[in-house]
């Protein structure tokens, strides 16, 4: 059976594929002091979903901690690596990148992304009150 990329059919570009293709891998943990380690293990298990880059962000109740890098999970998130020691928190989410498009600078495309919002001169921080 022909596969499509999920886009509307187009007469200009028939999108028929021979089989399944992999897409990015996402893994998260909530409520564990080892959230970053468990997330790195989960991303390692999902490495086939993206081999170009990986990133993890954690939350310790007051601050976010993130690390992103080109390459495989095992090369960047070893159990005793400085990066893992900095990823403190009980909540973590990670991403393996499988690019289908992107920037000339591949580092700019590694998730997770972060941003801040300012409105009317005030910075907004989203936390529980």
Question: What kind of feature is each model-predicted range?
Answer:
Residues 1-129:
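N-terminal glutamine amidotransferase
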């Amino acid at each position: 059976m022909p596969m499509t990329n999920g886009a509307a059919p187009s007469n200009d570009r028939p999108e028929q594929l021979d089989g399944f293709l992999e897409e990015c891998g996402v893994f998260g943990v909530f409520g564990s002091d080892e959230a970053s380690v468990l997330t790195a293990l989960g991303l390692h298990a999902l490495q086939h979903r993206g081999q170009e880059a990986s990133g993890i962000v954690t939350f310790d109740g007051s601050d976010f901690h993130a690390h992103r890098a080109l390459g495989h999970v095992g090369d960047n998130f070893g159990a005793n690596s400085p990066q893992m020691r900095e990823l403190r928190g009980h909540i973590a989410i990670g991403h393996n990148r499988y690019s289908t498009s992107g920037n000339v600078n591949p580092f700019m495309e590694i998730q997770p992304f972060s941003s801040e919002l300012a409105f009317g001169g005030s910075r907004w921080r989203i936390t529980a009150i």
